[in-house]
């Protein structure tokens, strides 16, 4: 997943729906700064502890709905190079996707456990100036019909 994003050590990224920070902590080793967003308070506390235990100081774990925290980052004019969206099964709210596009982010790595909401959200992003790049299904649950899918989207046009 991180390989798809082609992260650089000068990048500032966002990891939405970050849980206990697993992806954030791996990404933090490759980039300048990670803003990690999670709505579950105990998960944020665990993520902060995980960062401390691993001597990671460039990951900031923010408590709140991704949809709200993104608006706060926009109001602070935070410049972001890439975003990792590990979406819930219901997918993302359209307003959240519009906010991401409004930030001028060049690369979005979208992780989904629901092909239907993935397709819906990809269509929204296409309309917001992004194209679909690499797609990698991941069989995290062998013997079941569940599949995770990792998708790279790249900006090709300004937000509409």
Task: Annotate each PLM feature.
Residues 1-160:
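Rossmann-like S-adenosyl-L-methionine
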């Amino acid at each position: 997943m991180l390989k798809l994003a082609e992260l650089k050590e000068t990048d500032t990224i966002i990891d939405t729906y970050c849980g206990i920070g697993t992806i954030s902590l791996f990404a933090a080793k490759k980039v300048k700064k990670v803003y990690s967003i999670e709505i579950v308070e105990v998960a944020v506390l665990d993520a902060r502890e995980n960062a401390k235990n691993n001597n990671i100081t460039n990951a900031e774990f923010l408590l709140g709905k991704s949809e709200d925290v993104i608006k706060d980052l926009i109001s602070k004019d935070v410049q972001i190079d890439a975003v990792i969206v590990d979406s819930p099964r219901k997918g993302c709210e359209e307003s959240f996707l519009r906010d991401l596009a409004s930030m001028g982010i060049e690369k979005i790595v979208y992780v989904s456990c629901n092909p239907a909401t993935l397709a819906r959200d990809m269509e929204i992003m296409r309309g917001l100036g992004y194209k679909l790049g690499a797609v990698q299904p991941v069989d995290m649950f062998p013997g079941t019909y569940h599949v995770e899918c990792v998708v790279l989207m790249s900006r090709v046009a300004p937000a509409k």
